[in-house]
């Protein structure tokens, strides 16, 4: 993989500050399947004030205002959500290229992903585990944690490095989440436990969503991991 790839298509990004007013700490926010860059922007007032947020739109249009990072299919028998390797690889490499293009403007870069956006955030972490101050992973999953797909095995060749570095990850999910299946939760938990410095919180009564309590924990976590300077 090229260490400094150039993204073929510049993504649509909603920034919390205009270019001349951006702070030195960047938080990249990645929405879930069927949403867009505005979906999580309501979190901005509840996040640490010294962080600049870049909410990125996923590249695959589903319908007006609705996008995905890669296609998802549903098993007709089990209902399990799945995906094929190549679209995942293309999406992760394109987003990684954009991050590489903008990261030089900031002192720190952190990630926040919800649902399919969590899959993307943890995938970015697997490509470059030293690059991120922390990752906030909400109500989602880790892509192919057992590296069963050859094309993804090639992409995530640094998983052993991730386990050595132990990057900081906050993983929050709802106990009543109907979208992410229990087997997917279990394999995600196993991968995170084996590879990262994990803070895990399960929220009783919460579905596939973010509640006020979780948002407070996210704010505290980011403030601790990315402290204000000066």
Regions found by a protein language model. Name each.
Residues 5-110:
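Serine-hydrolase catalytic machinery in alpha/beta-hydrolase-like enzymes
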Residues 34, 144, 175-180, 208-209:
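Acidic catalytic loop of the alpha/beta-hydrolase fold
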Residues 65-73, 140-168:
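Flexible "cap/lid" loop of the alpha/beta hydrolase fold
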Residues 111-113, 138:
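Short beta-strand immediately N-terminal to the catalytic nucleophile in serine-hydrolase-like folds
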Residues 113-117, 121:
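Gly/Ala-rich beta-loop-alpha elbow adjacent to hydrolase catalytic centers
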Residues 130-143:
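A conserved short beta-strand
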Residues 165, 170-173, 177:
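Short beta-strand/loop motif that positions the catalytic acidic residue
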Residues 183-230:
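C-terminal catalytic histidine-bearing segment of alpha/beta-hydrolase fold enzymes
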């Amino acid at each position: 993989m090229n260490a400094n790839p150039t993204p073929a298509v510049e993504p649509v990004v909603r920034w919390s500050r205009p270019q001349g007013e951006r702070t030195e700490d960047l938080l990249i926010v990645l929405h879930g399947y069927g949403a867009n860059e505005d979906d999580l922007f309501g979190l901005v007032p509840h996040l640490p004030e010294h962080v600049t947020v870049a909410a990125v739109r996923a590249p695959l249009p589903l319908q007006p205002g609705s996008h995905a990072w890669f296609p998802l299919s549903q098993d007709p028998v089990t209902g399990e959500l799945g995906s094929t390797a190549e679209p995942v690889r293309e999406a992760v490499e394109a987003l990684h290229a954009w991050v590489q293009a903008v990261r030089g403007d900031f002192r720190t870069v952190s990630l926040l992903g919800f649902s399919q956006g969590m899959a993307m955030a943890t995938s970015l972490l697997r490509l470059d585990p030293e690059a991120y101050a922390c990752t906030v992973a909400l109500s989602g999953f880790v892509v192919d944690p057992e590296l069963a797909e050859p094309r993804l095995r090639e992409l995530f060749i640094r998983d052993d490095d991730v386990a050595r570095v132990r990057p900081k990850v906050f993983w929050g999910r709802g106990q009543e989440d109907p979208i992410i299946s229990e087997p997917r939760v279990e394999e995600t938990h196993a991968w995170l436990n084996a590879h990262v410095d994990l803070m895990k919180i399960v929220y009783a009564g919460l579905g596939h969503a973010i509640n006020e309590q979780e948002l407070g924990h996210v704010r505290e976590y980011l403030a601790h991991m990315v402290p204000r300077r000066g």
